[in-house]
Amino acid sequence: MNGKQQVTKKPSTEEDLSFTKFKVVPDVGLKSSQFEFVLGMPINQCIAMIQQHPRMLTKVELKYSKKDPFYQDIIIYIGSTGIRLYFDGLSQLIKLIEVDNLSMITLTYNDTIFSDPNNMATLDRVNEFFGSTHPGSYDDKHNIYVQSWPGLSFCFPYGGENSNLEVRPGFGGNLRSLKYDANSQPKLTKMSIYRGPNPSEPESVDTPFSCYCGQNRTRKVEAIWENGNIVGIDIQFDTQNGRIVDGEYDVSTYTRQIYFGDSVSDVQSILGAPTKVFYKSDDKMKIHRGLHKETLYGPPNFFFNYFVMGLDILFDFVSKRVVKFVLHTNAPGHCDFGMYSRCNFSIFLNDKQYEIRTDSKFDEFSHAFMNDSNPPRPVVLARQEQQPFGSTFCYGIKQIIVERTENGFLTSVTIYDGAKEK
């Protein structure tokens, strides 16, 4: 210890109550006065929101499968609220919201509190607030009684301190009802919000209008080939169109093409202004050019970063023309994870024999990168030593560079103008 003590300003009582008080919206999500978690929210938007409230949303854990990060769920648990968010591994959108610590949060429905840390909800109170529903189901394995409504379910324990509860047969299958006296009502232990009739198999959800915030969201990117060369990319994306539906701006889908050699104004007229403009301040390949060429290179090229689209576009500084596209997968475990939305792409190689997709593993198309049947040799992209994510490996063929992690999944695909220097 160095004798220093970190002092953190505690939020006021009003601030504390406002952020722990959430409105429950079945089939939609949880909403507070300062932020919301809704079904269909992209993971990078959720991470950004958590980072914007570091004093309120604390004890955050991120869990994912290292072996299969694209098809197993990604989970974010916010310990200070007891909220657990399940993201579909492929789409990276919230598909299930759980609250499993009711002592940390206040829940309301129709502007009335039905559970708070000092008076957690009982089965009777839940039924009173949410009305009649079908008989509940009983999980024999976990001794849990589940009461469900469309897009919403509540779990109550059975057994242990509640051993005086009696489970009665229902109308078939695992349907059951609980018998209990007024002094031993089961307390709510978990609430789930989802799309569809079954929380264990939530239906897929599109990004809601409220999450667009004036940004484009990519549906698919494909390469445009002409005479054996990639000349640009075809982008299908969703964007708000100005029409208002149910108090939110409506969304339309557009398909546009961006070519190598397009100007800055061409790109802005298609995609709008970028989230950020980034100037390349260093060039790690300069060492391969020789020291005598150091003065031959002028001002750096610059990127248009479209984080929400999972897309970067590089412009030549002198001509202000497009020379490169970078498509990001937002792979868990990569140092850029959470910065970009996932870009869904499908890049066929020239012979159409191999396809590079967002969820591809390098082994699926590695033969296309072989030279005279020899295994491809990667360029190792080493990050700073203090960061925990490790190195990635880059492989290149004509106009395409793929970057992958040790588990073989892709982190990015770069498409560059064959007429320009890489």
Swiss-Prot record:
Localization per record: Cytoplasm; Preautophagosomal structure
Top-rank taxon: Eukaryota
Keyword set, alphabetical order: Cytoplasm
Gene Ontology CC: cytoplasm; phagophore assembly site; striated muscle dense body; trans-Golgi network
GO biological process entries: Golgi to plasma membrane protein transport
Main subcellular location of this protein, as a coarse class: cytoplasm
Protein role: May play a regulatory role in autophagic activity.
Family recorded in the similarity comment: Belongs to the PHAF1 family.
Name by which UniProt lists this protein: PHAF1 protein T01G9.2
